[in-house]
């Protein structure tokens, strides 16, 4: 449970807020690379409450600049991407990827006025099929986010994104929560073709949670007791401030688990503003064979991010305005929720709480350890940054981490058994 004041601190990310200052110290996803082919029309981007446009110029450089022209504040979303810059269609002012004004055709040729005009622009980098942006102090740019999934060949990973209509922390906490999976995502029968989980998830609906603090965030394990003196252990990773890793390596029953290749999956919960998030979903395989087209289609259906499931601006077709198209008959006979898509099920729950949930009214239990740890870490980080310090997770210690799941004999030290696979550095109990 947080106080109302603490809740405000961790949820608000606009300019001048403590958590906004934290976010600006990291590289943040701004777009998927395929959204910006060369010389494409500009696209709208909203990050931390700022309205921006992104475009790729003739040389392949990506610009992320203020949406509004410096002249009369017309939207550059309506602009023309031409010959190395973005031109406003109102009076023809043209800007390069760094926000410099290149041309003012409505001003006398001899004037130097254009050299005095510059739009706000943020550095960008293309890594792993994602366009990343850095919005913080120029003297504190961190290393690029080279997670393992960003370094594999393109056909070994699957990327998507979708809007979540609630605060970023709400979205993140929905993913960090492990205990919900055996309820929210449960398939009621193996015969259903709808997204759902069975198998080990059903053995224990009250997993034991352990949190291990790292220098990038924390690793947490969820342990479920199985018959024959065994435990099903899932090790997750939380990388500050909005990354979550989860494993998919054991062939469970249930339609949501039909992808047989071992994978690590995850989400990035990026604040658009205080009441909306853009969730980037990634999956990569470390098998010998790449993901096939059928694998990618299955992942899209599983997540709820298939083309037919999203609008042009990445809003879910199944959304709060239509009650996520819940099917009460399916809820009775096939899946626990009656909502299609594992990630859509997550979104529905978090969005149902309202734009920013009042955490002062919660009653947390033993399976909420990871959520409590994340909140403590965020509050401490906000204090650290406010005092001039550096936040965790801006170095390279997380580059090779993985999330894993294993069946281990009873009595085995999970952290010790999984250490070589998850690569947690400098861990200690939370």
Model-derived regions, located:
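C-terminal catalytic domain of Rieske-type non-heme iron oxygenases
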Residues: 15, 61, 138-430
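A broad, low-specificity signal for short, low-complexity segments enriched in glycine/proline
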Residues: 3-17, 50-52, 85-86, 92-96, ...
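Short, charge-rich amphipathic segments
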Residues: 1-4, 18-21, 101, 105-113, ...
